[in-house]
Amino acid sequence: VLSRWPIISARVWRLPIGGGVDLARIALGVDLQTPGGPLPVLTTHLSALRDGSWLRQRQVAVLGEALRTLDAGSRRSIVTGDLNATPDADEVRALTGGTSTPHVGMRFVDAWAQTRPAELGRTLDPANPHVSGDVPSGRIDYVLAAAGGAEARGRVRSTELVGVEPVDGVMASDHYGVLARLRC
């Protein structure tokens, strides 16, 4: 987590893994000291197994437990990360309220979908030389803001993809980043 505001606490949660070629996964939760008070931020990288929706759903359930601890009722949480799933996937819909949520009363606004609903916002794109040709393109990286009412929807000011152009001939990653400007 990179922040202009001080990190006042941090905690790590281990996520379930699927075995085989899957890697160990964690969620990192921090509290940022913002002018509006502490801001809980949770970031993660969910399983990349192609047929791993079942596993990512289990991992999202752990995110729900983490949010219960981290958010402590503030309803200000931000969730970011490589979820390795498109917006219509069950694991993403669990966070955005499209299905039952992992933390009762906790639903998130997808910053990209709110500010650019007509744009795909592909963060994984075969046009990126680091992406192998057999990987489907799509938006799998997210900034999600807690949706505690109409006021929360106004927190997301803008979004854009970053890292889409090489610097000195080098791409930063196989994924493009999502930059979201939020009112905190």
What are these regions (language model features)?
Residues 19, 50, 117-120:
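Flexible, glycine-rich phosphate/dinucleotide-binding loops
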Residues 6, 45-47, 83-86, 115-117:
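Catalytic metal-binding/acid-base residues of hydrolase active sites
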Residues 29-42, 53-94:
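His/acidic metal-ligating clusters that form di-metal
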Residues 9, 48-49, 151-152:
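Short, acidic Gly/Pro/Ser/Thr-rich loop/turn segments
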Residues 21, 54-58, 134:
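Conserved phosphate-coordination/catalytic loops
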Residues 1-40, 44-46, 142, 158-161:
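Structured beta-strand-rich core segments of catalytic domains in phosphoester-bond hydrolases
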Residues 68-77, 85-184:
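Metal-dependent phosphoester-hydrolase catalytic domains
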